[in-house]
Amino acid sequence: MTLRLLEQGLTVRRVPQAPASGVGALHRTVARRSGPLLCSGLLDSWPARTAWSPAALVERHGERRVTALLDLPDTGVLFPQDQRRYERELSFGEFVEQMESAGPSAPCYLAYQRAHEIFDPADCDFASLVPPDGHPTDTRVWIGSAGTRSMLHSDLKDNFFCQLWGEKSVTLLAWRDSRAAYPFPDNLVNSQVDLAVPDMRRFPRLKHAVLHHVRMGPGDLLYIPRGWWHDIRAHTTSVSVNHWFGRPLGVAQYLALLGVLGPEYWKATARDFVEHGLLRRTESTQFFFSPPSTGKRLYDALRFGDFSRGNDPSSS
């Protein structure tokens, strides 16, 4: 994907890598929120590095019931159907069988699962990496076949993305370049851009932004600062875990972005404020784990004092 981006004339830089003793550099980077940082091999001593291989997980948790996404599309930014159409309940062992036989054109994913609900969260030592700051944290597990994708999106909180098994690529874009991400008019945290096939006629501002890219292997940790856009793709069968922490982005940052995006975005926000806020109509779920629309989030900010209500993973 990096070569294709370069061929389109885009600027792509490697994510900086911490030295071998990377915890100190990681803490300094997190304190400054200066940008993404790769810490290679930082997780090699974690029990999860060996205990969370697909085979080991099946041996310990094969009978556990899970809800997975099967036969996912391999192209496009939005699901062609509501996400619920891809959901299936099955045993974890059955899911791993599906995952290992899935072709790249119909990947499957056990995604966005709280770690403590299915596996032993003590296998991942985030306490040594994140000093307590009074803000809720949340840890999620992502297990899937080659070809699984989390399209370009932005999260409210700082994120440690950890690769335990297999390989994934991550492409990032700074929050300050959010206009180049071309958010959906009704959803400021999801991008219309598919970085695998970037349409430069539709999205010309990409040429003026800087993308950052990294390929992750087992034992690697990637720090993603809050707000930074990121696109994640699996090259192989993969087991990942991520940990959100710290103070979330607030309503002021999103209002500032909304202000520069223009009338199309203001109109969509006003519509959804009424339709999904005041009238409480259900929103569609064609994004990957769809967050509330911007209008609904502004409604929540006014009514409940919480712009991230329903989108802060530590509270959902």
What name fits each language-model region?
Residues 1-221, 229-316:
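N-terminal accessory scaffold of Fe(II)-dependent oxygenases
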